[in-house]
Amino acid sequence: IFFYEERNFQGRCYECSSECSDLSSYFNRCNSIRVESGNWILYEQPSYRGHQYYLWKGEYPDFQRWMGFNDYIKSCRFIPHPHSQYKMRIYERGDFQGQMMEFFDDCPNTYDRFRFRDIHSCNVSDGHWMFYEEPNYKGRQYYLRPGEYRRFSDWGASSARIGSFRRVHHMV
């Protein structure tokens, strides 16, 4: 992945080939990105915090193309090749309480399938997933690896509102 300080792949450039918890020393701002291979999660703050952005192979000439809110990218993580199976349980309350539903595929509208607008906890058994704040894969994004998420803050969200989610596939 190549990070550029200016739009349209101009200005200072930094090449990264693995995850990095703090990109601050390599560039001050990020206005364009070229992904040569693989899938990546970019974070607005160091140590994999803040707004998250999911990018795959392609060119992103300005931060709006990756649904960015500004030109801050301070950490990044490479997503390993996906598993052939996906499985996730979502819960209406924290600590895996309340109504539960199990999913194996994408969901463009959580309310239509779950009857709740909020997801307070989640258990990812297989695969990697992206949560989106709004239906139809819009709004803030949250990356989930296999593991237990007892509360929405565990996946980096400031509220439990999740409008849609999908499996992370390697995009080409």
Curated annotation (Swiss-Prot):
Function: Crystallins are the dominant structural components of the vertebrate eye lens.
PROSITE patterns from the UniProt entry: CRYSTALLIN_BETA_GAMMA
Matches recorded under SMART domains: XTALbg
Connecting peptide: region residues: 81-85
Gene3D superfamilies: Crystallins
GO molecular function, one term: structural constituent of eye lens
Domain Beta/gamma crystallin 'Greek key', first and last residues per copy: 1-37, 38-80, 86-126, 127-169
Annotated protein name in UniProt: Gamma-crystallin-4
